[in-house]
């Protein structure tokens, strides 16, 4: 068997394993990262495309596990954290970019990705800033690298600090960049954390549209942004479950399938972390991104533990 066939065979076997209940989110991510860093992913472009599609479908499926009332209440409870968090993250990110002398566009993209929704936010903001392809790529690679770290670190920190599932879910939803990493970290922590974290994260993601439009007006451009369709799908799924409670068992089965699809998604996400992606990041953007992420994570957790959040 030549090297190409061996890579394909290994990838296919591990992918199939991730579709079974025997593999959890953390194991799937580690297997994917190992493949990516060992240059053993035979289909990097297809992996990137299908991981995004599968993630969006999985998030919609998770909506069948929640009532619309739960979604609305969680969104209402976290909205001010989202508004304050986004504003402070953008301001601190701007300051850190100046401090570390990161390129203006790269710094802005990293800050925007950290504040709202990782790669989706970066992709939406890049045309507004007229960012070059290499600036966008560096910002995406930086956020992607930290997403992978968050999947492993957040559950460890949560258990170490003995956070309850509600606090961990809100913290993850507010402090982790991408939706995939939020659902991965929270699903490893518990069902309640997953439900809360996903809803809080999607509440943050809705802010892509108004923030991009505001930036476009400031820049004098015509770039528009729309709320991602999978967020509407998530709300629609929760509405269907609420309107048709007699099929609750079926909706629960759909939500269970969605959770297993998330395991497959995280394997694909990990497999996309190649050596080229790591090399592309560079020291200044990485230092800015890590500093911003640590500050946001720490301050968010402190805010959640203060008396007013009880």
Curated annotation (Swiss-Prot):
<feature type="transmembrane region" description="Helical">
    <location>
        <begin position="79"/>
        <end position="97"/>
    </location>
</feature>
<dbReference type="GO" id="GO:0005886">
    <property type="term" value="C:plasma membrane"/>
</dbReference>
<keyword id="KW-1133">Transmembrane helix</keyword>
<feature type="transmembrane region" description="Helical">
    <location>
        <begin position="107"/>
        <end position="129"/>
    </location>
</feature>
<feature type="transmembrane region" description="Helical">
    <location>
        <begin position="53"/>
        <end position="72"/>
    </location>
</feature>
<feature type="transmembrane region" description="Helical">
    <location>
        <begin position="227"/>
        <end position="244"/>
    </location>
</feature>
<dbReference type="Pfam" id="PF03601">
    <property type="entry name" value="Cons_hypoth698"/>
</dbReference>
<keyword id="KW-1003">Cell membrane</keyword>
<feature type="transmembrane region" description="Helical">
    <location>
        <begin position="193"/>
        <end position="215"/>
    </location>
</feature>
<feature type="transmembrane region" description="Helical">
    <location>
        <begin position="254"/>
        <end position="273"/>
    </location>
</feature>
<feature type="transmembrane region" description="Helical">
    <location>
        <begin position="11"/>
        <end position="33"/>
    </location>
</feature>
<keyword id="KW-0812">Transmembrane</keyword>
<comment type="similarity">
    <text>Belongs to the UPF0324 family.</text>
</comment>
<keyword id="KW-0472">Membrane</keyword>
<feature type="transmembrane region" description="Helical">
    <location>
        <begin position="136"/>
        <end position="158"/>
    </location>
</feature>
<dbReference type="InterPro" id="IPR018383">
    <property type="entry name" value="UPF0324_pro"/>
</dbReference>
<protein>
    <recommendedName>
        <fullName>UPF0324 membrane protein GSU2818</fullName>
    </recommendedName>
</protein>
<feature type="transmembrane region" description="Helical">
    <location>
        <begin position="286"/>
        <end position="308"/>
    </location>
</feature>
């Amino acid at each position: 068997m030549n090297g190409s066939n061996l890579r394909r065979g290994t990838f296919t076997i591990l992918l199939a394993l991730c579709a079974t209940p025997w593999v959890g989110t953390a194991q799937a991510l580690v297997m994917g990262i190992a493949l990516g860093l060992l240059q053993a992913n035979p289909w990097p472009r297809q992996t990137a495309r299908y991981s995004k599609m599968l993630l969006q479908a999985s998030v919609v499926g998770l909506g069948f596990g929640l009532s619309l009332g739960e979604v609305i209440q969680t969104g209402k409870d976290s909205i001010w954290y989202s508004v304050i968090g986004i504003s402070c993250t953008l301001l601190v990110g701007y300051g850190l970019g100046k401090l570390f002398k990161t390129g203006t566009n790269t710094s802005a993209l990293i800050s925007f990705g950290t504040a709202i929704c990782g790669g989706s936010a970066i992709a939406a903001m890049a045309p507004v800033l007229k960012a070059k392809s290499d600036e966008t790529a560096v910002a995406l690679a930086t956020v992607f690298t930290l997403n992978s770290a968050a999947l492993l670190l957040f559950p460890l920190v949560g258990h170490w600090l003995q956070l309850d599932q509600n606090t961990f879910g809100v913290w993850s939803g507010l402090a982790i960049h991408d939706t995939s990493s939020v659902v991965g970290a929270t699903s490893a922590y518990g069902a309640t954390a997953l439900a809360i974290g996903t809803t809080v994260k999607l509440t943050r993601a809705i802010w892509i549209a108004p923030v991009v439009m505001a930036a476009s007006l400031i820049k004098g451009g015509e770039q528009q942004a729309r709320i991602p369709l999978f967020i509407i799908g998530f709300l629609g799924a929760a509405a269907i479950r609420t309107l048709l409670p007699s099929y609750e068992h079926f909706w629960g089965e759909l939500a269970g399938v969605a959770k297993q699809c998330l395991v497959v998604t995280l394997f694909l996400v990990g497999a996309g972390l190649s050596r080229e992606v790591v090399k592309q990041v560079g020291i200044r953007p990485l230092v800015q991104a890590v500093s911003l992420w640590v500050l946001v994570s720490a301050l968010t957790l402190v805010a959640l533990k203060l008396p007013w959040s009880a």
